Amino acid sequence: MAQEVIKIRGGRTLNGEVNISGAKNSAVAIIPATLLAQGHVKLEGLPQISDVKTLVSLLEDLNIKASLNGTELEVDTTEIQNAALPNNKVESLRASYYMMGAMLGRFKKCVIGLPGGCPLGPRPIDQHIKGFKALGAEIDESSTTSMKIEAKELKGAHIFLDMVSVGATINIMLAAVYATGQTVIENAAKEPEVVDVANFLTSMGANIKGAGTSTIKINGVKELHGSEYQVIPDRIEAGTYMCIAAACGENVILNNIVPKHVETLTAKFSELGVNVDVRDERIRINNNAPYRFVDIKTLVYPGFATDLQQPITPLLFMANGPSFVTDTIYPERFKHVEELKRMGANIEVDEGTATIKPSTLHGAEVYASDLRAGACLIIAGLIAEGVTTIYNVKHIYRGYTDIVEHLKALGADIWTETV
């Protein structure tokens, strides 16, 4: 069967500007959250990625009028109807689990297929389920392909998350906005995307306090009205382009960025010796290799993002000694390692830690196992000698708006082919 591949001829120096898209991890929660509104919602600044289109079509399955035009989405929930969603759309997208919290909040009942997305080892939704149960929901998991969640009444509850989880924090917020009384989430995730979703819900009339701290309080309301809302910029896309610029850029400028959201990466760049100039909503970066070797450990926000440990890896081949990358969030998130070895990389992984030694990469045929692995392989291809061919690029398109066109505009020798 024919498939699209990305091809890169490495060695070009990049320069120019990139406008960073809206945050994928906000958009995939805010779009399901629109079904909680009674009336019209307009979202602006959405990323133009396949996940957004999938979620919009799930809204349409609930008889919601939804019009997606570029980065804008208009939603009218006036004729909303509950419906079962155990279908292939749900399976293709992990963030479809936000439909659970939103539908539970709106209808007190939902039947939904089990979510898919990037295969990153164990990513259970037990904390989500714990939260739903605390609010009064009963869960039927007897089916292997779908889940039924139902509540006679949703009542506020005190919920302590056993582990910090962005998905569970947001999903509980979605389910709790219409619950009677107060819901308190302890050990809540502090990510900017959690704050963004809370701000969106608040713009519709929800009563949420403490988003961005470890304790979030939600006082249930009777109704949420329509709203217009602008999604925050994507800190992971920004971080990926920062890594691209540090690898092979000369005067690359990134616009529409919140510097505070990428502070940990900027600090790591200072350690490496990358030239970084931070302004209000833009960052300028120059390649300044060879770099200093560093240690990186992923942590929950505001620590180093797990989503950036793969994109930063190719930079470490340009360092003057061995670097170590430990992923404490997803210790199995190292499927890119074998692909990098095909390109001549001196890299080994053992129990969640990669040892990365200075290497000269050459073009090869490689396979993107997940979204951020795909970003890593693109950066590796940009600095490699010869042509790199990346297969399974659908993962890359799930999270990066027009990445091939953006890189072409910066001067990269990159193109797509059908094989």
From Swiss-Prot:
Give the organism the record lists. Answer: Staphylococcus aureus (strain MRSA252)
Originating gene: murA2
State where phosphoenolpyruvate binds.
24-25
So what family is this one in?
Belongs to the EPSP synthase family. MurA subfamily.
Task: List residues modified as 2-(S-cysteinyl)pyruvic acid O-phosphothioketal.
Answer: 118
Q: Where in the cell is it found?
A: Cytoplasm
Transmembrane domains' residue ranges: none
| GO terms (BP aspect) | cell division; cell wall organization; peptidoglycan biosynthetic process; regulation of cell shape; UDP-N-acetylgalactosamine biosynthetic process
According to its UniProt entry, the function of this protein is described as: Cell wall formation. Adds enolpyruvyl to UDP-N-acetylglucosamine.
Q: What is this protein called?
A: UDP-N-acetylglucosamine 1-carboxyvinyltransferase 2
What would you give as a GO molecular function for this chain, any one?
UDP-N-acetylglucosamine 1-carboxyvinyltransferase activity
Active site as annotated: 118
- Positions contributing to UDP-N-acetyl-alpha-D-glucosamine binding: 94, 123-127, 307, 329
Protein's UniProt keywords contain Glycoprotein: no
Q: Which InterPro entries match?
A: Enolpyruvate_Tfrase_dom, Enolpyruvate_Tfrase_sf, MurA_subfamily, RNA3'P_cycl/enolpyr_Trfase_a/b, UDP_GlcNAc_COvinyl_MurA
The UniProt keywords, alphabetically, are:
Cell cycle, Cell division, Cell shape, Cell wall biogenesis/degradation, Cytoplasm, Peptidoglycan synthesis, Pyruvate, Transferase
